[in-house]
Amino acid sequence: MVRLSSRFYLQIVFLAFALMTGVPVYSWGLTGHRTIAEIAQQHLTNKSRKELKKLIGRETLAWWANWPDFIKSDSTWNHASPWHYVDLPGNMEKQKFIEDLKKLPGKNLYTQIQTMLADLGNQTLPADQRRTALYFLIHLVGDLHQPLHVGRDEDAGGNKIVVYWFDRKTNLHSLWDNMLIEYQQYSYTEYANLLNTREPDQVKTWQASPLEDWFYESHVISDSIYAASPNEAKLGYKYNFQFQKILDEQLLKGGVRLAALLNQVLSK
């Protein structure tokens, strides 16, 4: 019960802070992250479900999917901001991209997914540390599948590119974080159930590819987004039609791959 009330308090503080300061809600927004988490929940093994119950009781993955964004209003977590993205030049060949991804300095989205996965699977660590690793892992795998979290440094992953979504001024990153998803007009449970219909063989193929391939997929998609979304572009129905399939597939991939990682470390 203590964690419940703390979570609600943290949500209120974060949302109030965002409204007062104009800070954007980051990385897929609430609906996107919860959709990915709900899809993952549906692909967990029984063993993983039992292990998660020991850590978070009856709470769901979707419940904690946005916690790493909520804590951005707490300055003690400022060091975690770079964990949500990687920035590399555009239009890179796969081998060069992966080489440069592995050489990026400091802690970032690539390094921290691996760190959180290792911490979650380490049963010698305190439960609180493993819970924190779980919350971040849920969220960061979602961030990875938002293509502009594998964007370009010169425009801060699209944050500096102004676009107009049905005449509403915004930036390219926010469009992909929130507006495209909200335009579909589904709750996260509706969206998850709608998307979670692929054949098992396709799901297994997505899950089996290495982490570096997931990053490169997002990189390639981000290149296509940049090409279709120049500064001051006016976007609407045509843009949604162009990218809806990609949007849906990224959410689904994020969910089934998150489940694969959780099953990997919790079903031992």
Predicted feature descriptions by range:
Residues 2-13:
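Bacterial N-terminal signal peptides that target proteins for export
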Residues 14-19:
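Hydrophobic helical h-region of N-terminal Sec-dependent signal peptides
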Residues 22-24:
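N-terminal signal peptide c-region/cleavage motif recognized by signal peptidases
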Residues 26-140, 147, 152-268:
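N-terminal, motif-rich segments that launch catalysis or mediate targeting to/interaction with membranes
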